[in-house]
């Protein structure tokens, strides 16, 4: 037994010396970057974990959120860590296919390359078909939110800049693109170009009755902090790694509802949420999210799964929502795996999800993504699968 232990000890010493040699001159940057990334990721993970723990213990998400927003020191530490991760680690590993580039591509295709026109035309065909199938539908006075509001095709192409609101922006990555008039908001901004704003408690006012250039001027003069915004102000609202930050499904629901109010008709809600598992591991959860968000007056236009995240684009198809959304349990359908994890480590990069060592070190964000797999909600089929998706087979729906 002793020779075995001695041999094992020698082998471990050799491996240990090899690791040390990698940190000598010649390999310093890689070692330093890895250590820095571990430290920064730990800061972010602890904030998320502590929020969920407090919510499970107290159950009052409003009180917990207010206390969280008052912890300036920790919020500043979080903002600095997120910006450092984005600048020094995530951006270098995306190789041009990151979450920001995905948002840019979706917006360009939709607003400048005819995507919006095609979507509106499809709505018109769907409305005509529904009318033919239900001739007495309009006479009965029944409000059908599955039939989108049809708007004349006089604004299907964007003529000016895309007015974009980036919620939880941290460092306003969309500001560098000429296509966007970007407004970044965060509870604790990491840079001066981001306005301080608590989106959960943002007050929504009546829409502005201004010309487009006047609305652009209004956005350009916004100052921090932002406590209120007019409705129907933006063409795009982005939730990039935002919804999983909140410990309560109802908070995620509030965010999506506010996004619906802030978007113009046919505007886009882009949602990016972390997940390092394979594409089908949380397929039921993604279907549940789709149904819940569409109930607000959206229709999912695109879905993609990268190696570390889900990416979804929803189009606002109705100016109003139904009045009984809460009783239908839609808020609870915006769940994440961590909501049911009570065993301590509860983020997407925990060992129970069979992640690699490198993935365990990284926080819920995209690094080197796989090719995206667009999903057409209208057709019910994924481009990499011919199997249709029937919503009524979703176990979450059966439970609720």
Swiss-Prot record:
The UniProt record lists the keyword Methyltransferase: yes
Cited function: S-adenosyl-L-methionine-binding protein that acts as an inhibitor of mTORC1 signaling via interaction with the GATOR1 and KICSTOR complexes. Acts as a sensor of S-adenosyl-L-methionine to signal methionine sufficiency to mTORC1: in presence of methionine, binds S-adenosyl-L-methionine, leading to disrupt interaction with the GATOR1 and KICSTOR complexes and promote mTORC1 signaling. Upon methionine starvation, S-adenosyl-L-methionine levels are reduced, thereby promoting the association with GATOR1 and KICSTOR, leading to inhibit mTORC1 signaling.
Organism whose genome encodes this protein: Xenopus tropicalis (Western clawed frog)
Family membership noted in the UniProt record: Belongs to the BMT2/SAMTOR family.
Superkingdom of the organism of origin: Eukaryota
Database matches in InterPro entries: Bmt2/SAMTOR, SAM-dependent_MTases_sf
A single MF term (Gene Ontology): S-adenosyl-L-methionine binding
Keyword match S-adenosyl-L-methionine: yes
Coiled coil, from the record: none
Identification of the protein by name: S-adenosylmethionine sensor upstream of mTORC1
EC assignment: 2.1.1.-
UniProt-annotated binding residues for S-adenosyl-L-methionine: 99, 168, 186, 198-199, 240
GO biological process: cellular response to amino acid starvation; methylation; regulation of TORC1 signaling
Keyword terms: Methyltransferase, S-adenosyl-L-methionine, Transferase
PANTHER family, alphabetized: S-ADENOSYLMETHIONINE SENSOR UPSTREAM OF MTORC1, S-ADENOSYLMETHIONINE SENSOR UPSTREAM OF MTORC1-RELATED
């Amino acid at each position: 037994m002793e020779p075995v232990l001695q041999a094992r000890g020698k082998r471990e010493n050799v491996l240990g010396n090899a690791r040390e040699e990698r940190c000598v001159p010649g390999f310093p940057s890689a070692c330093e970057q890895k250590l820095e990334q571990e430290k920064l990721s730990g800061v972010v993970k602890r904030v998320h974990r502590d929020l969920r723990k407090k919510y499970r213990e107290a159950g009052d998400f409003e009180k917990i959120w207010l206390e969280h927003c008052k912890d300036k020191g920790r919020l500043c530490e979080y903002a600095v860590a997120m910006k450092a991760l984005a600048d020094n680690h995530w951006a270098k590993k995306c190789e041009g296919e990151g979450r920001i580039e995905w948002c840019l591509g979706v917006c360009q295709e939709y607003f400048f390359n005819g995507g919006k026109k095609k979507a509106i035309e499809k709505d018109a065909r769907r409305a005509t078909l529904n009318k033919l199938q239900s001739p007495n539908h309009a006479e009965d006075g029944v409000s059908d939110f599955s039939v989108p509001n049809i708007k004349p095709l006089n604004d299907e192409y964007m003529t000016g800049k895309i007015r974009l609101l980036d919620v939880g922006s941290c460092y306003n990555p969309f500001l560098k693109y000429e296509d966007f008039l970007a407004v970044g908001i965060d509870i604790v901004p990491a840079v001066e170009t981001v306005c301080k704003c608590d989106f959960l408690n943002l007050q929504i006012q009546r829409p502005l009755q201004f010309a487009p250039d006047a609305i652009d001027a209004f956005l350009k003069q916004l100052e921090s902090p932002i406590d209120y915004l007019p409705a129907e102000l933006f063409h795009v609202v982005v939730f990039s790694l935002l919804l999983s930050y909140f410990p309560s499904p109802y908070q995620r629901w509030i965010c999506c509802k506010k996004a619906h109010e802030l978007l113009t008709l046919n505007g886009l809600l882009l949602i990016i949420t972390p997940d390092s598992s394979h594409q089908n591991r949380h397929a039921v959860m993604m279907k549940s999210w789709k149904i819940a968000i569409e109930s607000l007056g959206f229709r999912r236009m695109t879905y993609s799964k990268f190696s570390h995240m889900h990416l979804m684009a929803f189009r606002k198809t109705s100016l109003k929502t139904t009045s009984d959304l809460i009783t239908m349990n839609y808020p609870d359908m915006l769940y994440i795996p961590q909501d049911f994890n009570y065993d301590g480590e509860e983020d997407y990069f925990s060992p129970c999800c069979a992640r690699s060592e490198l993935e365990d070190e990284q926080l819920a964000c995209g690094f080197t993504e796989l090719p995206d797999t667009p999903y057409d909600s209208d057709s019910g089929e994924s481009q990499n699968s011919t199997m249709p998706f029937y919503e009524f087979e979703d176990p979450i729906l059966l439970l609720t």
